[in-house]
Curated annotation (Swiss-Prot):
Membrane topology classification: Multi-pass membrane protein
Keyword Ubl conjugation: no
Role played: Involved in the efflux of sugars. The physiological role may be the reduction of the intracellular concentration of toxic sugars or sugar metabolites.
TM annotation in the entry: 15-35, 50-70, 81-101, 103-123, 136-156, 168-188, 209-229, 246-266, 273-293, 301-321, 333-353, 364-384
Protein name: Probable sugar efflux transporter
Family, as annotated: Belongs to the major facilitator superfamily. SotB (TC 2.A.1.2) family.
Gene: sotB
One Pfam family per UniProt: MFS_1
Localization per Swiss-Prot or TrEMBL: Cell inner membrane
CDD domains given in the database record: MFS_NepI_like
Annotated HAMAP family: MFS_SotB
High-level lineage: Bacteria, Pseudomonadati, Pseudomonadota, Gammaproteobacteria, Enterobacterales
GO molecular function: carbohydrate transmembrane transporter activity
GO cellular component: plasma membrane
InterPro entries on file: MFS, MFS_dom, MFS_Efflux_Transporters, MFS_trans_sf, Sugar_effux_transptr_put
Length: 399
């Protein structure tokens, strides 16, 4: 009995360490969102030019997720994770020392390579290391790590950047990763590769219209969100004319509201996922349309960011559940594709936002983001009516 209790404790420690790793990997992807103005100032550039760094990072992750997953499919998982972390930490050290913008971009590409592999293996690892009968809880812990990065990662990164300079934010993330690596080395057993997806499952997945339509919805709605969200920090300072501190508060509120979205989805997601996702997309559309009108009043901006945070968390969780339900037989490949497609949306949104800022005006990012949001809303209503029960049908077997 005692041994069993100890092994359960160790199993949970392993999963928690993976969840912390998920938090760190997601924090670094979005940290630049809160630091665009500072990085731009230090290199004498426009924020919209620096914003391209978000696009490059996201698209590297998108392009490399599947190839890297296949290339590393036979590698023992403990060794692979250690290698990933070494690349991740070294790249952050390079970010800290980046003597020009090109070097910073190169360091971010190194981080993106590590990110691409990490996300293609981490859900499967959490399931393998979970105590017996606790697979769903293990997955939700990883999702929580991811969600908390949105809630606290970006604002904490911004606060460190505000007080100690943006380079310290990247160094702090690298140090956090070093501590996590030490825990992983101590806790992880040898993990031979198993159940890795292969290219054989790709044609099968792409012949599932319900799954493909969810992928299309993902890329469109994520593009809408990131068109405005990527530039929220310079928007608050230049368009709304508010302080850098207020931008930090706004990012905290938006992230914190994600917890409400997560709880709502946990309560209602199994039965009403389709309706909940469409409702959240409608809410996102309203937030984007109201972004500029709300910018004249700090209270209105704070209220808007609560609804925005709830909406985007429900959308993110809902899409994952839909993908898993449509591909219970090939979760690794389906989720690797989902991660890639999500990142295509992040990159596209950041790119559109930067072009709008450069050629129209920063004030228009919400209105331009509302266009794909409207398309996503119409598309979601169409596909969930066409395939209404794909999620609920598979749910009992999958959980």
């Amino acid at each position: 009995m005692t041994t069993n209790t100890v092994s359960r404790k160790v199993a949970w420690l392993r999963v928690v360490t993976l969840a912390i790793a998920a938090f760190i990997f997601n924090t670094t992807e979005f940290a630049p969102v809160g630091l665009l103005s500072d990085i731009a100032d230090s290199f004498g550039m426009e924020t919209a030019q620096v914003g391209m760094m978000l696009t490059i990072y996201a698209w590297v992750v998108a392009l490399m997720s599947l190839p890297f997953m296949l290339l590393t499919s036979k590698v023992e998982r403990r060794r692979l994770l250690i290698g990933l972390f070494i690349l991740f930490i070294a790249s952050h050290v390079l970010s800290f020392f980046a003597w020009n913008f090109d070097v910073l971009v190169i360091s971010r590409i190194g981080i993106a390579f590590a990110h691409a592999v990490f996300w293609s293996i981490t859900s499967a690892l959490a399931i393998r290391m979970a105590p017996p009968g606790k697979r769903a809880q293990a997955l939700s812990l990883i999702a929580t790590g991811t969600a908390l990065a949105m809630v606290f990662g970006i604002p904490i990164g911004r606060i460190i950047g505000q007080y100690f300079g943006w380079r310290m934010t990247f160094l702090a993330i690298g140090l956090g990763a070093l501590a996590t690596l030490a825990c992983l080395v101590k806790l992880l057993p040898t993990l031979p590769s198993e159940h890795s997806g292969s290219l054989k499952s790709l044609p099968v997945l792409f012949r599932r219209p319900a799954l493909v339509s969810v992928y299309i919805l993902t890329v469109v709605v994520v593009t809408a969100h990131y068109t405005a969200y990527s530039y929220i920090e310079p928007f608050v300072q230049t368009v709304a004319g508010l302080s850098g501190n207020f931008a930090t508060v706004l990012l905290l509120i938006l992230g914190g509201a994600g917890i409400i979205g997560s709880i709502l989805f946990g309560k209602l997601g199994n039965q009403h996922a389709s309706g909940l996702i469409s409702l959240a997309i409608a809410l996102l559309l309203a937030c984007l349309l109201l972004l500029l009108p709300a910018s004249h009043n700090p209270q209105h901006l704070m209220l808007l960011s609560i609804f925005w945070g709830v909406a985007i968390m429900i959308i993110g969780l809902g899409m994952q559940v839909k993908v898993l339900a449509s591909a219970p037989d090939a979760t690794d490949v389906a989720m690797s594709l989902f991660s890639g497609i999500f990142n295509i949306g992040i990159g596209a949104g950041a790119l559109v936002g930067s072009q709008v800022s450069l050629h129209l005006s920063m004030a228009s990012v919400g209105y331009v983001g509302a266009i794909p949001a409207l398309v996503a809303l119409v598309w979601s209503l169409m596909i969930f009516r066409r395939w209404p029960v794909s999620l609920e049908d598979h749910q009992p077997h999958h959980s």
